[in-house]
A protein has these predicted regions:
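Conserved core of the sugar-phosphate nucleotidyltransferase
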Residues: 58, 67, 109-195, 202
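Acidic, glycine-rich loop-and-beta core segments that form the ion-binding/anion-interacting portion
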Residues: 266-338
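Catalytic cores of nucleotide-enabled group-transfer and carboxylate-activating enzymes in metabolic
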Residues: 4-5, 48, 88, 97, ...
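Glycine-rich hexapeptide-repeat left-handed beta-helix
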Residues: 311-459
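N-terminal nucleotide-binding beta1-loop-alpha1 segment
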Residues: 1-19
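Short catalytic helix/loop segments, enriched in acidic residues and glycine
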Residues: 20-36
């Protein structure tokens, strides 16, 4: 099979986005648009991907760099043909191969659609193939013109078309496949004699047709996947479509999502079978969720590794790891570098940061546990705080297995509580507690008799 090189057009600023960032780096479903396009073309068989940069190229290069990805710079944006010309040195030596040209702001394109376009060009001995779509409102798009037999004649841009031509509803999507040799020969003949004064890549098709070469129009089954993103409104629409696709893929794989329209799951998230995701849940980044979990409602996980059988209710977690069969929430904050093992209970209004919590430990309510190592079956009473910051440095607490920490205990780090030790409620612990000992760190209660001289409360 002949090689396929993808050219991703990513040079534009995208002024309608009203942003300091390149348009193609705005995210849809957690992934920059151009990266989403690159992933799709690679899955469709592209062996080499050439990204044409322009506005803030250093940011685009930094974010999109990867294996078999190459960058060329378009100093002036003089049209789509001019953009492709910048990439010619990277595919000119393989005239028998194919070149896929795709816009970096079309993140909804499916792998199957691109594969179909490539096959149409290859199987019908085409010099090129054009992905088209039927639009109810085609304003702003180039129109695909056909003859009486349905063969493609040319593509005319909105600003160059006659009223009859602009009445056509079949539009050019900006995604093309070319036989490499045919593209190279035709690019040399493209000029900028048009209303915009630009070098249109679409002129290549007219050149090929006049030379008696085949240009194959292929209509997309779903016109929405060809949508280009040019504004924040279109960005939100693209995000919505990809989010629903992701939810449908997960449901088809055995995940229950009770309301996909109120659930946000990004592209790179993985979820195991028989997990139930309740409304208001957001799964972001590289989050991985195991089997038989219940997530939500109103739970947000970002870059979290979550094992099997976990129940998370109104949990906010970031860059942490959970084992199996943990009960977390409601109203729990799990901060980075936290590792919860198995069968752990973390209840109302608890915050855990940079801590390792072993099997069976309970932090039921109103607790701050930071920079700490907790052994198995430790119990933290209500109101316990690990006092980990001295104003300059952070220090760790170590609490060994089966220790019982009484309510409203302050553990002033660095401190070590031994196995099966107790702390009395209300204590401030500043020294290590031996195993099986009871630590009392509070003032002795003093009752002052006759404190009230006369009864000020009357019936």
């Amino acid at each position: 099979m002949e090689s396929l090189t993808a050219v991703v057009l990513a040079a534009g600023q995208g002024t309608r986005m009203k942003s300091q960032w390149p348009k193609v780096l705005h995210k849809v479903c957690g992934v920059p648009m151009a990266e989403q396009v690159i992933r799709t073309v690679k899955k469709a068989g592209s062996e080499k991907c050439v990204v044409v940069t322009g506005f803030k190229e250093e940011l685009v290069r930094e974010r999109l760099a990867g294996e078999n990805i190459y960058f060329v710079h378009q100093e002036e944006q003089l049209g789509t043909a001019h953009a492709v010309m910048q990439a010619v040195p990277l595919f000119k030596d393989n005239r028998d191969g194919y070149v896929l040209v795709v816009c970096g702001d079309t993140p909804l394109l499916r792998q199957e659609t691109i594969e179909g376009l490539v096959c149409a060009c290859r199987d019908h001995d085409g010099a090129a193939a054009v992905l088209t779509a039927i639009m109810d409102n085609p304003f702003g798009y180039g129109r695909v013109l056909r003859d009486a037999k349905g063969h493609m004649i040319s593509i005319v841009e909105q600003k160059d078309g006659t009223p009859d031509q602009l009445a056509v509803h079949e539009i050019n999507t900006g995604t093309y496949v070319f036989k490499t040799g045919a593209l190279l020969d035709s690019l040399e003949k493209v000029d900028n004699k048009n209303a915009q004064g630009e070098y249109y890549l679409t002129d290549v098709f007219e050149i090929l047709i006049k030379a008696g070469r085949k240009v194959i129009p292929v209509a997309a089954e779903d016109a929405s996947e060809t949508m280009g993103v040019n504004s924040r409104i279109q960005l939100a629409e693209a995000d919505r479509i990809l989010r629903i696709r992701k939810a449908e893929d997960l449901m088809a794989a055995g995940v229950t999502i009770t309301d996909p329209y109120s659930t946000y799951i990004e592209q790179d998230v993985e979820v195991g079978q028989d997990t139930v995701i309740l409304p208001g849940t957001m799964l972001q980044g590289k989050t991985k969720v195991g089997k038989n979990c219940t997530l939500g409602p109103d739970t947000q996980l970002t870059d979290v590794i979550c094992g099997d059988g976990n129940h998370l209710n109104r949990v906010y977690a970031h860059s942490c790891e959970l084992g199996d069969n943990n009960e977390i929430g409601p109203f729990v904050h799990l901060r980075p570098e936290t590792c919860l093992h198995n069968d752990i209970k973390i209840g109302n209004f608890v915050e855990v940061k940079n801590s390792d919590v072993d099997d069976g430990t309970k932090l039921p309510h109103l607790i701050y546990c930071g920079d700490s190592d907790l052994g198995k079956n430790v119990n933290f009473g209500c109101g316990t705080v690990t006092v980990n910051f001295d104003g300059k440095n952070k220090h760790r607490c170590t609490i060994d297995e089966h220790a019982f920490i009484g309510c409203n205990t302050n553990l002033v780090a660095p401190v070590h509580v031994g196995a099966r030790a107790f702390t009395a409620a209300g204590s401030t612990i500043t020294k290590d507690v031996p195993a099986k000992a009871l630590a009392v760190g509070r003032a002795k209660q003093l009752n002052i008799e006759n404190w009230v001289k006369e009864d000020t409360y009357k019936d």
